[in-house]
Regions:
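A charge-rich, low-complexity, intrinsically flexible signal that marks solvent-exposed coils, linkers
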Residues: 40, 73, 156-157
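Short, flexible turn/loop "capping" segments at secondary-structure junctions
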Residues: 1-2, 69-71
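C-terminal cap/linker of serine protease catalytic domains
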Residues: 131-157
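Short aromatic/hydrophobic contact patches that present stacked aromatics
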Residues: 5-7, 50, 76-78
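Core segments of cupin and vicinal oxygen chelate
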Residues: 8-57
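Vicinal oxygen chelate
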Residues: 10, 14, 24, 55-59, ...
Length: 157
């Protein structure tokens, strides 16, 4: 186990979430599933208690802890994309699997985890600053899923 791992709290379906992430994102995998050795307040002996997985190279643990805690936008995974096809693939996988759209390239999966599906053309423009950054930013603001061609056009002016 790595020295630093992100632990995500799930109600009871960390294993399902980890499998989805492993199937959806590159450099992602499902690792060990640790089963509860005895009954606990929100589960029974033999239920998946923790699940080790990797999302885009980031080590994580999913903890099936019950309904006490909910996810918020205060934590999100940001996935950099190279083109519209890649942006669409991740966005559609998340939203099409019971997730929901939000603004400015953000969406939530069906477990409540927030994702930023962010084309590099946008982050590159913002990093450079100046008028092109302002135009790219203004073009992004009304979008849900980012339209790469619209951002490219905004950068060009």
């Amino acid at each position: 186990m790595p020295k630093n791992t992100i632990c995500l709290w799930y109600e009871h379906d960390a294993e399902e979430a980890a499998r989805f992430y492993a199937e959806t994102f590159p450099q992602s995998s499902l690792g060990a599933v640790f089963r509860a050795p005895a009954d606990y307040p929100d589960g029974k002996a033999g239920d998946a208690l923790t699940v080790e997985f990797t999302v885009a190279g980031i080590p994580c643990i999913g903890l099936n802890g019950g309904p006490q805690f909910k996810h918020s936008e205060a934590f999100s995974f940001q996935i950099a994309t190279d083109d519209q096809e890649e942006t669409d693939r991740y966005w559609n996988a998340i939203v099409g699997n019971g997730g929901q759209e939000s603004q400015c390239g953000w969406c939530k999966d069906k477990w409540g985890i927030s994702w930023q599906i962010t084309p590099r053309v946008l982050t590159d423009a913002l990093a450079k600053g100046g008028d092109a950054a302002k135009r790219a930013f203004e073009a992004m603001m009304p979008m849900k899923k980012i339209d790469v061609a619209a951002i490219e056009a905004a950068v060009r002016g």
